[in-house]
């Protein structure tokens, strides 16, 4: 469902930019294009790549590699699936709100400081999605902890990714919640000095990309799996050298 939604948003962007002028987006709601870009980026990263590569492959392959019938907390892992599905619904509800500003998938201030329902729904969806990812990361670390040294390259890569997510997700969540605080509680965490405030919107960028680099690790992990499996079978003696060269 997430992949289909992301592809549809991508097609809308491509059709709209095919030539100059309005094509499929109404001139009465031009801000829909900004909302489209926001939701396309967030859905493809947080609801397609990370659940598919990190959640799907991890839940399937980590128990196989460590010789376990299941991950250590399977019921808790079901909660992460529920949180991810709920966050996707919250994200898609942003399409049904009033005409408003799309802050982009990075949710940078000051664009994200306008007190509109679209931005709030996007932020709440990200926070709920982060909670599901945090639960999955804890599950992975505890499942593979005792057999980490004996496992193949895939398991340490997933565990390292999980540890990075455990440390960086609370930072991103705090930065996003401070945006809501600025919008509705008159705080000045991210309100810049241009408006006479003492906030620091650049600090938000540092906090966001502190997590943003970690979110790319599930993509790298899949490369580790493919290179490790192929090179180990065909080039046993020089496999690690080939893997590093490919990466």
Question: What are the residue ranges of the model-derived segments?
Answer:
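Membrane-embedded and interfacial regions of multi-pass energy-transducing membrane proteins
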Residues: 1-247
């Amino acid at each position: 469902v997430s992949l289909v939604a992301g592809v549809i948003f991508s097609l809308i962007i491509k059709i709209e930019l095919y030539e100059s002028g309005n094509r499929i987006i109404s001139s009465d709601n031009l801000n829909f294009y900004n909302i489209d870009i926001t939701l396309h980026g967030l859905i493809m990263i947080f609801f397609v790549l990370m659940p598919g590569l990190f959640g799907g492959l991890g839940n399937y392959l980590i128990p196989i590699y460590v010789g376990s019938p299941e991950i250590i907390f399977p019921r808790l892992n079901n909660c992460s699936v529920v949180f991810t599905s709920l966050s996707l619904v919250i994200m898609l509800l942003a399409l049904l709100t009033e005409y408003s500003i799309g802050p982009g998938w990075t949710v940078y201030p000051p664009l994200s400081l306008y007190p509109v329902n679209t931005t709030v729904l996007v932020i709440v969806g990200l926070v709920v999605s982060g909670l599901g990812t945090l639960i999955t990361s804890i599950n992975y670390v505890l499942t593979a902890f005792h057999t980490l040294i004996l496992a193949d390259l895939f398991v340490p890569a997933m565990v390292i990714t999980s540890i990075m997510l455990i440390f960086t997700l609370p930072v991103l969540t705090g930065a996003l919640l401070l945006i809501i605080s600025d919008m509705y509680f008159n705080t000045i965490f991210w309100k810049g000095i241009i408006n006479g405030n003492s906030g620091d919107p650049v600090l938000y960028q540092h906090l966001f990309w502190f997590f943003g680099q970690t979110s790319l690790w599930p993509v790298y992990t899949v490369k580790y799996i493919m290179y490790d499996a192929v090179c180990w079978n065909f080039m046993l003696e020089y496999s690690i050298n080939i893997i590093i060269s490919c990466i």
